[in-house]
Amino acid sequence: MRYLRPLNSCLRGIRSGSSFQPLAQSLNTRIRYSSSFAKTDMESINTTERLAGLRELMKKNKVDIYIVPSEDSHSSEYIAACDARREFISGFSGSAGCAVVTLEKAALATDGRYFNQASRQLDNNWLLLKQGLQDVPTWQEWAAEQSENGKVVGVDPTIMSASDARKLTEKIKKRGGNDLVAVEENLVDLVWGDSRPSRPKEPVKVLARKFAGKDVKTKLEDLRKELLKKKSSGLIVSMLDEIAWLFNLRGNDIPYNPVFFSYASVTSSSATLYVDSSKLSDECTAHLNENGVSVRDYSKIFGDAEVLSQSLDAEDTKVKKFLVSSRASWALKRALGGDAKVDEVRSPIGDAKSVKNETELEGMRACHVRDGAALIEYFAWLEHQLVVEKVKMDEVTAADRLEQLRSKQKNFVGLSFDTISSTGPNAAVIHYKPEPGNCSIIDPNAVYLCDSGAQYFDGTTDTTRTLHFGEPTEMEKKAYTLVLKGNIALDVAIFPKGTSGFALDVLARQFLWEEGLDYRHGTGHGVGSFLNVHEGPIGIGTRIQYSEVPLAPGNVISNEPGYYEDGSFGIRIENIIMVKEIETKHQFGEKPYLGFEHVTMVPYCRKLIDETLLTRKEKHWLNEYHADIYSKTKDFFKGDELTMSWLEREIEPL
């Protein structure tokens, strides 16, 4: 759960001499994309002129209400700067939300992670719809309410999923409104004009088998078996991480996510990658040819989809439908012929990708040890700078140092998201993003929350630790310990196969709930293997979709409960855990039982733990975990007395 910095490239410090060549500047230079709309993260901008321009275009297109989603044409959570339309029109830079603009009003809807941030960033042209709160309408409900009396609602069909378009249409119809209108030219792009960033054209690289663990031919064979089971003519793939995983390729088009703009189609006899071929090296082209994958230009997907749709009519078969992800765009589904020829499903590629193979699992273990060593060195250094050297250090300078330490680790590629380095009240902003010139000096007498991660060739990391370099208050210690207890409870959980993350969420919240406390974000998200740090379809939380996908051995997921007091402090503890089978004395109903293996190797903050709130079992678990960290990371600190001293102090048994 974090915000994506709008940069033109995401893998910023790729090691020279590796199979991936440097795609950006040195890690010693912090790169930032600066567009006409980009301002500091917590500063509002005046959107009056932009809204006026948009409303003029709405009138010309005979649209009364215009929807501006966060996503790009691939339903990406994290997007390239050229696709940050919702941010441009609203000024809100969070990674989740939807803007609804009428000829008189404008509303921005977002979830609890971003209430604080949105309140700071939206100017007085905007109404904030706090999703999930009682008596607050969803953005669909608000848009439908505005559509009464025959008003027309429009959207760019390439950036709204077919399922979202259908749900919105249903809401509008219930209000007596018209059908949702597909506006073929994006109106925000027209307002943005020449200042809109260009689309990235970064090179695509082959991911070696020693990191991928499974070759492309095997993945295609497995996928075709799934298509046969579903009696489908083929699958059209629009999710960028699914395409990268399927073809063992990695790119650099979206910040922090090693993916590239593309589509793909797979049938029983063919596989096609739709991509700008100028981005493919000779190695990529040969790799695709060897695996029976043809290449077509990215722009050809919609025309080819129409041809595929027509081919179904000519086939002498009972199989009459293509599969698309439930997150595929409305435009793509229309090109394929709509409901008559398309089934929206949970992607079989997404399901396969979420179950890591043994090579990927071993890579996740290894990269988390190296990443943990970098974090341990960072926290030891930071404490020394603040407490001993009395350095006045801001949040960005500290984050830069952490990135530098990570860059020294084997297989390092870049960050997996923009580091959340937050002191005191900033830590209560769940997706806080410090910027140079608009960040705080780290206060050693306040809570410091650091949520950070990296991309390595052998895995993706995401770790949050909350520290205190002075004397924490009793409430800070209590909150931290309650969050820690929830983190431990989830880590040690044992549950029958078929259990979902929805069912496990209560384990992490239970101790906070006993005190009448809670947090407004999910407890866990899936994590990719040198792919997106947020990966579906699994998750741990209260979202209903998490009840639909049971956890399975090989899943990699985060465990990150928290607690936040606006204007005061924030607590979050995050480990990455892997689902595995557990040997139990009994197996009721002959059903296997599952549990977790933690791979994050960073100690908890000793100073913030209230030992009186921990049980004997929790203390034992904590001591065992800290001993494991020490044994796996100590060799990284030979000759480094400062770091070794800090580590030994933090892991001293309770």
Swiss-Prot record:
One of its GO terms (cellular component) is cytoplasm. Its cofactor is Mn(2+). Its EC number is 3.4.11.9. Mn(2+) 1 binds at residues 462, 560, 574. Binds 2 manganese ions per subunit. Mn(2+) 2 binds at residues 451, 462, 574. InterPro entries: Creatin/AminoP/Spt16_N, Creatinase/aminopeptidase-like, Creatinase_N, Pept_M24, Pept_M24B, Peptidase_M24_C, Peptidase_M24B_aminopep-P_CS, X-Pro_aminopeptidase_P. Keywords: Aminopeptidase, Hydrolase, Manganese, Metal-binding, Metalloprotease, Protease. It catalyses: Release of any N-terminal amino acid, including proline, that is linked to proline, even from a dipeptide or tripeptide. It comes from the Eukaryota. Catalyzes the removal of a penultimate prolyl residue from the N-termini of peptides. This is Probable Xaa-Pro aminopeptidase P. It comes from Botryotinia fuckeliana (strain B05.10) (Noble rot fungus). The lineage of its organism: Eukaryota, Fungi, Dikarya, Ascomycota, Pezizomycotina. The gene is ampp.
